[in-house]
Amino acid sequence: MRKIVLATNNQHKINEIKRIFKLYQFLTLKDIGFDQDIVEDGFTFEENALTKARVVHDYVVSQKLDCAVIADDSGLCVKAINYEPGIYSARYSGLGDEGNRKKVLEKLLGIQDRTAYMQCYAVLIMPDGYTMIQEGKTYGLITKSKIGDESFGYDCIFWSNKLGKTFGQASIEEKDSVSHRSIAMKPIKEYLDSINYRGLDDSEY
């Protein structure tokens, strides 16, 4: 079975992508011996996702590995604060998830419009270099305090319009059904399914 390299060390992302791509087999960056620091200096989620995918793809090719690569970049965009934290979501405060959430909530003190969305750009690069880019968005509001599980990102302060609860309150299945990452990744999975990627060799796609 042909495998896919995931261009991330974030275990939460890895777990979510594995749930979306049921029956597919994956390799992590550690599995392939990739230990470079990828500089994410783009101005958009799309640019950063492409950078990660291309750097890892180049490494995969150099190691003569017959694998596709999937990367993504994603984050929270809050309308009232000029769509911050945006591409800086993971390092917004410099103090990790708790600090990031606190900074968003502090910036929204006294503000009524708490409209926000989660955005993801996902990139697939096939072994021959064919590249596919997909976007996913899911809309909601920022709560005034943390609600639900606090273990991942902004989930406990992002109230999903579709679910009627925060991502921190949602079950894994509920979140996967509406998440920005799931929306972006599903067309990539559909493409790989359509070419029977798991059963192909290089000459067949």
Where are these regions (language model features)?
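Anionic-ligand binding patches
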Residues: 2-5, 11-205
